[in-house]
Amino acid sequence: MNKSSMFFHMLKPFKQVTITTRQLSKESMCNDTAIEYCANIVKQYDYENFMATLLMTKALRSPALVLRAFNVEVARVQDQTSDAQTAEFRLQFWLDTLKTIYKKEQSIKNIPANPIAQELFKICKSYGLQKRQLDKLITSRSELMRTKHFKTLNDVEKYAEDSVSPIYYLLLSVAGVSNVHADHAASHLGKAQGITNILRSVRVSSYHKIVTMPMDMLMKHNVSQEEVLRSTDSENMRSVAFEIASRANSHLLMARSIDVPSISKQIFLPAISVDHYLTKLQKLNFNLFHNSLLLSSATLPFSLYYNRVLKKY
């Protein structure tokens, strides 16, 4: 069973939508079109999470697409411009938008004419989502843009907690789950996925002349920043990758070991993608720069579907 056949019936509702600035200003834009826009953003820039989201129940799927589209927009800011001030302005737009959304007795007419912002307003009001979790998705990216590196592996872990875990906390709120064990699992999964994202971004970050691998690990294994920027494979580099991947895997195992409410398991389905990457990296003896890591996994769609049916993650 291939990727396209398995997900074809789910992909059909999300037609490719291109929305111009003029179109965004129209108050008549229907809810379905806005959701399609969010879905296309996630599909284009966060495909693995998009596939996992399609396997969620209908009631959770649309809010999940909105939250992930918001996260994509925030995460992409640093890739869209090399000018730090412009990037900060774009992040400030979203911080200001959140302030507007959370004003008492707010009307959608006062929300910026942006489909993601308007859909975010709707789900925040419908589900009483915590503003601080949405704020974290922005401020974590803003802080990284200023520092441009991580001093320690613990700093990477904190960044992962702040830039990924909030999505899971918010989705649990949408699902009506108020459970300390589910929150604990969400924290560990966010850390696992966030740390893995750092590993996966090493090549891209190197292209932008940024070293995202923690300095303490590089120093411990005698790897220079220049070696990272040149994508130099070596035993020492693999030792760095091994330690970082081990931390991610430890959090993944913790997330999976916790007994959580049944509905939470579909929310935590991206754990399968994290496991796939870490397993592949291990088979490559932790060579971060192997070209096969750039290829999508042919078995991932089946694994997501299989684990969804079994209610596992």
Give the residues covered by each predicted segment.
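Cytochrome P450 catalytic-domain "roof"
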Residues: 145-153
